[in-house]
Amino acid sequence: MAHARDYHRSNVRELFPIVVDAYRRLADRYDVVVLEGAGSPAEINLRASDIVNMRMAQAADAACLLVGDIDRGGVFAALLGTLALLRPHERARIRGFAINKFRGDLSLLTPGIAAMQRRLGLPSLGVVPWLNDIGLDEEDSVALDDAPRIAAGAWHAAQTDRSRALRVAVVALPYLANATDFAALAAEPSVDLAYAEAPADLERADVVILPGTKDTLGALRWLDGGMGDAVIAFAQRKPVIGICGGYQILGLTVADPHGVEAGGARSGLGLLPVRTVLTREKVTRAVRVYPRRFALFGREPHVSDEIQGTGYEIHMGQTTANSRLSAFADVVRGGVERVVDGAVSANGLIVGTYVHGLFADDPIRWAFVRAARARSGLHAPAQLAAYSAQREARFDRLAAHVRAQLDLQPLLAAAAGAAATRLPRRRSLPTRRRSLR
């Protein structure tokens, strides 16, 4: 089993060249490349193995913006401490600082900003006020912190109104991954989505989803505590969907002969006649999805041949199905390779797929909501969300908000290779592209 120390040691030796190659491919296609760091750029205990912050900035010869989150408190100390811990050649890349998520009277912040400019010798490029109801995807760990829990009382009251919301329970597996799979579904007016942490949480649900997980074998061990039996019982009468690791869990067995996770093998829930072998090679592909024509959840409306969508695969494992089992979809990888994905039980109640991001496509999500509501004896949805268009509008709103508050000219000038009006001129690059971090 791999340990954290081994992972960090392999970062620079094995992973960093791959990251640099990916950057170069982007630099060949775009005039500006934005590098997003992770955590702090000044974690001195991890400096030797950090490949996403200043090491990457050095490789791309990037102009950098240091951003502090004032909502966490202590923003001035964080900015000053970060600059103090950076090495001289790293500090030289910082073109300015900005403060994010500010709430309150900006005039109260102004003296601190002025003092920081004097002390750091760097300009403030602006303060971004807090933006309410941003409605955009967050990282898994962040998204789950505030996600609704069924145990918190979401569905304790009996609801017999056929116009009520469809209750979707996402099983809170250990090391849950790709929580953004459910953002579009949760945005539907006729859907109430929450996370299930105990077997009793499934009692009032209409649909159960087993999400992706970074540790399928560990999730199966956790399911042995009672949740697995609850899902099996639920599946006898109501729909269950498994995505990626959740799909593997629905099968007969998951084997790990190469020690990708913990090694060994475990029995799955046995709801689909498929078997999975975890592999060393990780599949990461954007795909186009063409769901097969079948009666979703055993009820009308059928999934039609005209419905299609996009998504992505990111998994370590090969799943083989019984030859008589119906596939969920045909998937096209890279625009050329056509493969079969997933599985559907004979009664249409159990669906498994490796494709993430399916619910973000309006036609696929709408088909799911309609079929699930019909299966649950609920009225057809009175309204369906145009999530794709709404998501683009939210990005535009955020971009306008940031653009109005930040002076990005110094960074853009550096990225374009031009002299910045208020900042030192940067040296020329041997390549024809510039980068921002």
Each language-model region and where it sits:
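Conserved AMP-binding/adenylate-forming
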Residues: 290-293
